[in-house]
Curated annotation (Swiss-Prot):
Organism of provenance: Salmonella arizonae (strain ATCC BAA-731 / CDC346-86 / RSK2980)
Matching HAMAP family: 23SrRNA_methyltr_F (MF_01848)
Record EC number: 2.1.1.181
Gene giving rise to this polypeptide: rlmF
Catalytic activity: adenosine(1618) in 23S rRNA + S-adenosyl-L-methionine = N(6)-methyladenosine(1618) in 23S rRNA + S-adenosyl-L-homocysteine + H(+)
GO molecular function, one term: 23S rRNA (adenine(1618)-N(6))-methyltransferase activity
UniProt protein name: Ribosomal RNA large subunit methyltransferase F
Family from the record: Belongs to the methyltransferase superfamily. METTL16/RlmF family.
Length: 308
């Protein structure tokens, strides 16, 4: 078991305060959502979901050359800096085997979402190729529209519909396909009621109107599943055994530290050879992902050599 100290990744492009003037020049629509803090400093109205969406649009255009990005109302609008952190820490993990970050890695994004955020960042930063799985037809259509609207992305990102709501990797990872890593931002609530309660807390903290959080607060399949995050990840762990020779590293975000012990036990039960925890922090928010592999050091090196 190994762990890193929390902190924004040094390669993350969002280390400093947003250059709002530059972002507004890239995406003029952001201008109408600027406000002043009590200290008189210019900021974005984070209580307004449309403002957060405009900020995301500007960040993706300014830093990642995504000139066309949009999501339908009701789907998650992810914070770009935190999503970028996952990608950079994953890059470090992949680089540990050979001493350098791979530039032609194949990555599977489980639940790519309407926003397609991880493939957009990973393809730009490292030239990785992504397969994104998605159970929602509406989310998949949105992600596909983003890919088609931006030159070159169709060569880097492909999408696959998960038609079996009880499966995670099955039906997505095909025979004779190999992936350097999988990543996932799993649903963390165990019921729609719990998801609504979480959204309500977020709304109150931001001072939003009751309807605002519904605009980009997330769909049910993005926020909740039966049994919650632990049950979902346990299923992922169990299913990963089937693809133990086709995937170098399986990874997933874990929203709460108290969820880790049962997941570690599940990983021991399936015979994971190595388990890694990566701690991350964005502002006041603490997060982490766990990674596991069924290959020892020599097998991982051979996997990479053979794949290349």
């Amino acid at each position: 078991m190994s762990a890193q100290k929390p902190g924004l990744h040094p390669r993350n492009r969002h280390q400093h305060r947003y250059d709002l003037a530059a972002l507004c020049q890239t995406t003029p629509e952001l201008t109408s959502f600027l406000t002043r803090t009590p200290a008189g400093e210019q900021s974005v109205d984070f209580a307004n979901p449309q403002a957060v969406k405009a900020l995301n649009k500007a960040l993706l255009a300014h830093f990642y050359a995504v000139t066309h990005w949009d999501i339908p109302q009701g789907f998650l609008c992810p914070p770009v800096p935190g999503r970028a952190d996952y990608i950079h820490h994953l890059a470090d993990l992949l680089g540990e085997t050979t001493g350098s970050i791979p530039v032609q890695a194949n990555i599977l994004d489980v639940g790519v979402g309407a926003n397609c955020i991880y493939p957009l960042i990973g393809a730009y930063e490292y030239g990785w190729r992504f397969t994104g799985s998605e159970i929602s037809e509406a989310a998949m259509s949105s992600a596909q529209a983003i890919i088609q609207a931006n030159t070159g992305l169709s060569r880097a990102i492909r999408l696959r519909r998960q038609k079996d709501s009880t499966a995670i990797f099955t039906g997505i990872i095909h025979k004779n396909e190999y992936y350097d890593a999988t990543l996932c931002n799993p649903p963390f609530h165990d019921s729609a009621a719990a998801a609504r309660a979480g959204s309500e807390r977020k709304r109150r903290n931001l001072g939003q109107k009751r309807d605002d959080v519904l605009n980009f607060g997330g769909q049910q399949q993005e926020l909740c599943c039966e049994g919650g995050e632990v049950t979902f990840i346990k299923k992922m762990i169990a299913e990963s055994q089937t693809f133990r020779r086709q995937v170098l590293w399986f990874t997933t975000l874990v929203s709460r530290g108290e969820n880790l012990p049962p997941l570690y036990r599940a990983l021991t039960e399936v015979g994971a050879v190595k388990v890694v925890k990566k701690e991350m922090a964005q502002g006041q928010k603490q997060s982490r992902f766990i990674a596991w592999t069924f290959m020892d050091d020599d097998q991982r090196r051979r996997f990479i050599t053979r794949k290349r």
